[in-house]
């Protein structure tokens, strides 16, 4: 049984109270029934649950609706393909059918939040086992299908693998990719990707922590495997002179576009503190690149 949760807020400022109450009311519209399961969709016209946002969104909403918070993790685990691939998005159609969509990865804000929900929901052993199995299978899938040149960096096959709508650095890459092999006749993909490589790091990093919690003797094994991914990412995609990560195209050529994705690597933990500090110092705090008092709009 899930623990009971709730949120209350009251203040003497009538305008602030009205704003809070309206925000709570608006957010209730994002609770949707996907069959028998209540989930929290992204909102703003986005009626699916996406792997890039909604495991995180579910965790953020746990005090208000624990059931939805858990379902935002469980639906991705329950709809995982037999070969290990996790759906990039899950949609509930008007007739009530649930469609897990495997035509893109669409980011990977999942392992950390799914593990956090284990703590918040009461530390059920079966849930932890289910999460570990899911992550191990997905990691294996990634290395089976996304390192076509064997360079130790995992690849993006389409624009929506990394959720970068209209990104020019993808060239003529397709928006979606439904195959487990690279698209033919594309000029950039398969792209050695800091994002997709970090997906594996996040899986292995979380599996190391799960192993510690379960005491199954594999903590060090997963830690070493995670560190190996981070080392490959640094060796192939990090530029020491420019203090940022840069993806490589299908020919191994560096894609010379400075983008915010190194920040994503910070989130996944796939780059070191030293690398993160250098990126912040050289770019986020650099007034010659943008007006530093304001957040980078793409990052915002």
PLM ranges: what are they?
Residues 6, 10-48, 71-101, 148-191, ...:
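Extended glycan-interaction surfaces of carbohydrate-active proteins
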Residues 140-148, 181-182, 186-195, 199, ...:
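Calcium-binding acidic motifs and repeat modules
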Residues 61, 179-180, 212, 221, ...:
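Compositionally biased regions
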Residues 188-202, 218-221, 225, 254-257:
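Short, contiguous, pocket-lining structural segments
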Residues 39-40, 52, 110, 134, ...:
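Short hydrophobic/aromatic segments of transmembrane alpha-helices and their interfaces
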Residues 15-23, 65-78, 124-143, 203, ...:
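Extended, well-ordered alpha-helical scaffold segments
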Residues 47-73, 77-164, 197:
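Aromatic-rich carbohydrate-recognition surfaces in CAZymes
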């Amino acid at each position: 049984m899930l623990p009971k949760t709730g949120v209350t807020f009251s203040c003497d400022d009538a305008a602030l109270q009205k704003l809070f109450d309206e925000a709570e009311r608006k957010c209730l519209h994002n609770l949707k029934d996907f069959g028998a399961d209540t989930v929290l969709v992204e909102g703003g016209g986005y009626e699916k649950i996406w792997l890039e946002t909604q495991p995180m969104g579910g965790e953020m909403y746990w005090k208000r609706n624990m059931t939805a918070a858990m379902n935002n993790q469980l639906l991705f685990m329950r709809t995982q393909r037999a070969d290990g691939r996790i759906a990039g998005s899950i949609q509930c159609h008007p007739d009530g059918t649930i469609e897990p969509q495997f035509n893109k990865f669409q980011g990977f804000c999942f392992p950390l939040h799914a593990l956090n929900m284990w703590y918040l929901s009461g530390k059920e052993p079966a849930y932890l086992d289910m999460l570990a199995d899911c992550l191990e299978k997905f990691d294996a899938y990634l290395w089976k299908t996304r390192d076509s040149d064997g360079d130790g960096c995992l690849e993006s096959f389409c624009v929506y693998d990394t959720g970068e709508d209209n990104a020019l650095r993808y060239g003529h890459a397709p928006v979606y990719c439904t195959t487990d092999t690279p698209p033919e006749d594309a000029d950039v993909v398969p792209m050695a990707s800091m994002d997709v490589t970090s997906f594996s790091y996040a899986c292995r990093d979380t599996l190391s922590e799960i192993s510690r919690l379960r005491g199954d003797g594999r903590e060090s094994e997963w830690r070493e495997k995670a560190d190996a991914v981070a080392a490959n990412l640094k060796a192939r995609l990090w530029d020491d002179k420019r203090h940022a990560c840069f993806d490589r195209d299908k020919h191994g050529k560096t894609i010379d576009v400075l983008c915010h994705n190194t920040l994503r690597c910070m989130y996944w933990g796939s780059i070191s503190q030293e690398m993160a500090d250098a990126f912040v110092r050289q770019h986020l705090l650099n007034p010659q690149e943008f007006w530093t008092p304001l957040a980078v709009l793409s990052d915002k």
